[in-house]
Amino acid sequence: MTDSIPHIPVLVKESLSLFQDQHPTTFCDVTVGAGGHAEAFLTSFPSIEHYDGSDRDLSALALSEKRLLPFKGRVCLRHASFDEVNALTPDGMYDGVLADLGVSSMQLTDLERGFSFQGEDHPLDMRMDTSRGITASEVLNSLREEEIGEIFRKYGEEPLWRSAANAVVHFRKKKKILTVKDLKDATSGVFPSYRLRKKIHPLTLIFQALRIYVNQEGAQLKVLLDSALRWLRPGGRLAIISFCSLDDRPVKWAFREAEARGEGRVLTKKVIMPTYEETRKNPRSRSAKLRCFEKSLKISDE
């Protein structure tokens, strides 16, 4: 880990605008990362007296701790997943909750983490929390072909999931898949020439699938969507930034269903996406989508 802060937060102005008329005093950032959004919120809203920032990535927390030193006394950082945050959070605690889903550019550029195609000789890890859990390498070397194929299909929506799973199992009979290069070699004959000519790397969906499975991102997102409204005070707002349809779809439907139940209203009737200027400066932002839900002011009789 370096002392620099390479991660550029996305949709910052748009995220701030969703809380502009609210003047929040308590805020929860469940993916604080390197502290980019936190810095923007704490600077823009002097009204925030208590900002809880959590993340599964200890390296990111170390960076955010340095970045947020000017706001000492207003910030509390903790190493926690969504389910752990839920266990710690009482009802009606926050005016706002923010989640920035997916992998960060900081994690991608740290080749030791195994998230990037570029780190060929680096271990195929992919854990956001390197202190626990199984690695992508362990998944590929231990699960049955059918299980690996299901991961590629369900979490990557990879059209060639059967062929890719078969290639992995065939390769590991001769050599364990331990590095990024091993996975590339294992699947080298899977993709047709038109996939190889595209700008998007042919292994993109496979990497996505492994990352989501290793980090149980779907289960963690479900915890967030099932619980975050409970954390909010009446009139509080939940903003979620997603980067792929597997994340955005559940968010969209959860917000719609909560609105239908009378729990509040969707503030982003049209999903918010980055401007051309932002995507030019930060290409990673191009697939970002921001949605926001406001909890009802009405207090339940239950």
UniProtKB/Swiss-Prot annotation:
Catalytic activity from the UniProt record: cytidine(1402) in 16S rRNA + S-adenosyl-L-methionine = N(4)-methylcytidine(1402) in 16S rRNA + S-adenosyl-L-homocysteine + H(+)
One Pfam family it belongs to: Methyltransf_5
Class in the EC hierarchy, top level: transferase
GO molecular function ontology, one term from the record: rRNA (cytosine-N4-)-methyltransferase activity
Gene Ontology biological process terms, A to Z: rRNA base methylation
Annotated Gene Ontology cellular component terms: cytoplasm
Keyword annotations from UniProtKB, A to Z: Cytoplasm, Methyltransferase, rRNA processing, S-adenosyl-L-methionine, Transferase
Compartmental location: Cytoplasm
EC code(s) of this entry: 2.1.1.199
PANTHER family listed in its UniProt record: 12S RRNA N4-METHYLCYTIDINE METHYLTRANSFERASE, S-ADENOSYL-METHYLTRANSFERASE MRAW
HAMAP family with a match to the protein in the record: 16SrRNA_methyltr_H
Function: Specifically methylates the N4 position of cytidine in position 1402 (C1402) of 16S rRNA.
Family from the record: Belongs to the methyltransferase superfamily. RsmH family.
This protein's name: Ribosomal RNA small subunit methyltransferase H
